[in-house]
């Protein structure tokens, strides 16, 4: 697992180690111990434990987001595409942050197998670039309807 900081250093691309041979391929899609160790090497805080996994299916051109949750239920998200492709976007909405209002976009595909770590305090969204795109994300807090917000 290799972590690469984006233009907003707290948002990190995760490139998993993929082992391929004539039978196909294998990868660890998540390893908490390694994830935390790699974040620490970058001087980034370790997130709260993941408590919910979500799975979405989108047709090409569908835009989802930009969503976030207010305290006391902010969500950090670890996201990936398992089928198709998406342009994934994180916008810094943290008050007092030196990167407040800045955004990063990363193409996540089933082929490149990258993931994106988006900490609490960011609005998040994506657009499906291919038909039948399936998107998985782990969150550090449960969905809380009363705390959910959207930037349209």
Where do the language-model regions lie?
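Non-catalytic, conserved peripheral segments adjacent to functional cores
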Residues: 1-111, 130-132, 139-152
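Conserved metal-binding segment of the jelly-roll/cupin
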Residues: 108-130
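A short beta-strand-loop-alpha-helix capping motif that often carries His-Thr
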Residues: 123, 135-138
């Amino acid at each position: 697992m290799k972590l690469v900081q984006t233009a907003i250093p707290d948002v990190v691309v995760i490139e998993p180690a993929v082992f391929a041979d004539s039978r196909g391929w294998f990868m660890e899609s998540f390893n908490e111990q390694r994830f935390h160790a790699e974040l620490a090497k970058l001087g980034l805080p370790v997130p709260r434990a993941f408590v919910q996994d979500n799975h979405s299916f989108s047709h090409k051109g569908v835009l989802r987001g930009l969503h976030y949750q207010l305290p006391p239920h902010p969500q950090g998200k670890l996201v990936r595409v398992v089928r198709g492709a998406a342009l994934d976007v994180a916008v810094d909405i943290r008050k007092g942050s030196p990167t407040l209002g800045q955004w990063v976009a990363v193409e996540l595909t089933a082929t490149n197998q990258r993931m994106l770590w988006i900490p609490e305090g960011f609005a998040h969204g994506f657009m499906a670039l291919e038909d039948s795109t399936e998107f998985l994300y782990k969150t550090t807090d449960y969905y809380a309807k009363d705390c959910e917000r959207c930037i349209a």
